[in-house]
């Protein structure tokens, strides 16, 4: 908080005519002293009053949101002093992309003015709302006042959740060795899910409704064990990513991880969902269930940044902590097979992997994921190739930061009603 003299001209004129009055007394000099000195005193007192009596309060409804949510902020500018603030410049130091609350406004003496600002949260991440700097001054521009308000709050923008109807997760603990055995004679006809027909599958395991719907053969994945935990392993090694800006494989991987976690926890098919990622900071969230855990996963994904740990090393390190008979969902843009030995080693613990390959060619890279998908197919590991088009899905889940939503069977999000708690919360 400071008050600054913008120009020395007025004080200089005042002292000059004061000196002239001392050297050559005259009523003219006296009048000029009164005029210049009075103006100097008045503007100084005016600025001092603004410095002492201007206050700004910032309030938000939520301190977390999801991509696509609307951020609304309320500002209250108070001037309880005896003079008006003919102009007040508000400088916003928020870091949310595409959002600025900066403006110029005036406020009368002993009065209050309130306004709102709005923005759409377009990018996941952790941002700050506030602080704020107020600049004002007297109407003649002799003095300026600058007031810094440090109050701020953290806004977490979590990734969107999108429907993934074609991704089917291999159930964990199949027959004790982590993989389905399609030729075992004692399999039942109770199917937990389906996968593409592979060489060696028994024709009697063909799932005809899915085959007819998709135009190619699908086999039943039989439920040989109770629902197991899901571990989502997200590869954010910066050396294997493709794409530019916010349309890249890191963002697609984060969205896929968020969507799978949301799907698993809402369907309550797995006992719990865990998250493993090694970016600039390691994320290790053991499998749990419930809404609180879902939000914890989304917050961790919101803060995730690419690191330098290769997928093979991440799987080797994580192996002893994953437990047995679980479903492991690997999300990666790596098209080199150097991490596959680390993955196959986990099969002997009863870990059933499902691999989501993000096709780098859809992000402008020269190579695609087809060759690696073929290697995984030979090993009998379910794999899905996903591309850049998922980032443009209009059905992206807009979250609960501002409204409450329901998802239609087609995956479209429809607002149902505002959330019950719409109270304003002050920054600070």
Cite the ranges covered by each PLM segment.
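Detector for methionine-enriched segments
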Residues: 1-3, 20, 42, 158, ...
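Extracellular/lumenal glycan-associated context and N-glycosylation machinery
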Residues: 1-57
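Short, structured coil/loop segments at alpha-helix boundaries
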Residues: 6, 22, 26, 95-96, ...
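An amphipathic, basic-hydrophobic helix/alpha-beta surface used to engage anionic
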Residues: 37-284, 327-331, 345
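Membrane-proximal, solvent-exposed terminal domains/tails of membrane-associated proteins
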Residues: 181-428
